[in-house]
Amino acid sequence: MFDGIGFMELLLIGVLGLVVLGPERLPVAVRSVTSWIRAMKRMANSVKEELEQELKIEQLHADLKKAESKGLSNLSPELQESIDQLKQAAQSVNRPYQVQDVPAPENQIHNPASQSVSTEASPSASSAPTSESNQGEDTRSNPKANG
């Protein structure tokens, strides 16, 4: 990192920093500079990894096109391995989006409108108490009715 800077130059920078910032603020400044350098290194490494991944994907696409043009029968082992990797990647991408043909019973939506026809004809629905049958109750148990 400090290829062109020797020990004397680093010592001079340290002394100047001590004079300019003082002994109280110099450690804080050094920590903030090192954290900035770490953040820049992390960002550079992540960009590098993303570019390598994109180049690998482009190489797989190029290998696939090359294999299609040659025909899939006479391929080199490297090319066959690249095609297999590409097929596995395509299957792993498509796998989460597959739709099941038959939904499970617990996943079905309950539709009360379809059952209303069957409950109207059942005898238990006609034996339910109505407000007219409750009128004959004793009013002594209800203090508001006595008033």
From Swiss-Prot:
GO biological process entries: protein transport by the Tat complex
Listed transmembrane segments: 2-22
Record flagged with keyword Transmembrane: yes
GO cellular component: TAT protein transport complex
Sequence ranges of Low complexity compositional bias: 113-133
Keyword Nucleotidyltransferase recorded: no
Protein localization: Cell inner membrane
Record's subunit section: The Tat system comprises two distinct complexes: a TatABC complex, containing multiple copies of TatA, TatB and TatC subunits, and a separate TatA complex, containing only TatA subunits. Substrates initially bind to the TatABC complex, which probably triggers association of the separate TatA complex to form the active translocon.
Family: Belongs to the TatB family.
General function of this protein: Part of the twin-arginine translocation (Tat) system that transports large folded proteins containing a characteristic twin-arginine motif in their signal peptide across membranes. Together with TatC, TatB is part of a receptor directly interacting with Tat signal peptides. TatB may form an oligomeric binding site that transiently accommodates folded Tat precursor proteins before their translocation.
Protein name (Swiss-Prot/TrEMBL): Sec-independent protein translocase protein TatB
Native source organism of the sequence: Shewanella sp. (strain ANA-3)
Gene giving rise to this polypeptide: tatB
